[in-house]
């Protein structure tokens, strides 16, 4: 069960990294470039790789807690 949760977290983390990557097709296709610039630059002026790591760790912890409800992880 823990292996499945870990694999799912790896997929989610990879998808988040893909979305926050520099030049990718999904970001450029679904969101206009000026909207991306306005939203990201005003919301995340210091959005560095450290910030990405913090967000990924928090998301992974939340997913583990959310999926681990009712599952004895001891």
Swiss-Prot record:
Protein topology in the membrane: Multi-pass membrane protein
Gene (name only): CTAGE1
Tissue expression profile of the protein: Testis. Expressed in several cutaneous T-cell lymphoma (CTCL) cell lines, in head-neck carcinomas and carcinoma of ovarian tissues.
Residues spanning the membrane: 1-21, 46-66
Location of the protein in the cell: Membrane
Name of the protein: Cutaneous T-cell lymphoma-associated antigen 1
Note: Cancer-testis antigen containing the epitope FVLFLFGGN which is detected in sera of CTCL patients according to PubMed:12839582. Tumor-associated antigen found in several cutaneous T-cell lymphoma (CTCL), and in particular in mycosis fungoides patients and in Sezary syndrome patients. Detected by 5 of 15 sera of Mycosis fungoides patients and by 2 of 3 sera of Sezary syndrome patients, but not by any control sera. Expressed in around 35% of the tested CTCL tumors.
Keyword Lyase applies: no
Annotated Gene Ontology cellular component terms: membrane
Keywords for this protein: Membrane, Transmembrane, Transmembrane helix
Main location per the UniProt record: membrane
Organism expressing this protein natively: Homo sapiens (Human)
Keyword DNA damage among record annotations: no
């Amino acid at each position: 069960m823990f292996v499945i949760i870990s694999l799912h977290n790896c997929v989610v983390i990879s998808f988040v990294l893909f979305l926050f990557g520099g030049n990718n097709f999904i970001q450029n296709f679904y969101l206009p470039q000026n909207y991306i610039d306005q939203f990201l630059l005003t919301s995340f002026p210091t959005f560095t790789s450290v910030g990405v790591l913090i967000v990924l760790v928090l998301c992974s912890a939340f997913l583990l807690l959310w999926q681990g409800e009712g599952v004895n992880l001891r």
